[in-house]
Amino acid sequence: MTVAATSPHVMPTYGRIPIALERGQGCRVWDTNGKEYLDALAGIAVNTLGHNHPKLVPALQEQLTKLIHTSNYYHVPLQEQLAALLTERAGMTNVFFCSTGLEANEGAIKIARKYGIDKGIAQPQIVVYEHAFHGRSFATMSATANPK
């Protein structure tokens, strides 16, 4: 299969590599011609568990028959159990669950600012990677000098 230009229906937010991926297993992916690649991007760092993991697929399939996602307005017992485990292991008091990296970065910025203000720091400063991608909200885009 020859990879054509990106569909006009897809916003051109990335310069796409001329490869059409079809499937994955662990840290490897295959294109529509059957060529194998090492997935060093992991879905831009959001797919760190790999592709088609034999222990994850059944667990995810089972969860899909129950709840995919629900608002934090409700108690979610498994989420609360995970929070207890994470806080115990990290020595922290609570966790903030997010759906995206943008939410995590935005939340971290807000928490860091609040911490600084609570400590009496007039203008708390936050350390971020320069020219890195932290999300597409105004707060995360203005956290670095990345013009995109």
Task: Give the predicted meaning of each segment.
Residues 1-94:
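N-terminal glycine-rich, Lys/His-bearing helix-loop that initiates the first secondary-structure elements
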Residues 83-148:
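PLP-dependent aspartate aminotransferase-fold enzymes
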